């Protein structure tokens, strides 16, 4: 496996991560922030 193969394979991993993982983490942090604000 050389660098060019890894570079062409990388977007297939990154696109779902950016598309699903990042919004999920953002929503989770926002939810925790709202919940902690409401309790205090």
From Swiss-Prot:
Residue pairs linked by disulfide bridges in the UniProt entry: none
Pfam families on file: PSI_8
Keyword Transmembrane helix listed: yes
Coiled coil: none
Topological type in the membrane: Single-pass membrane protein
Family that this chain belongs to: Belongs to the PsaI family.
Record's function text: May help in the organization of the PsaL subunit.
Protein name: Photosystem I reaction center subunit VIII
Organism expressing this protein natively: Synechocystis sp. (strain ATCC 27184 / PCC 6803 / Kazusa)
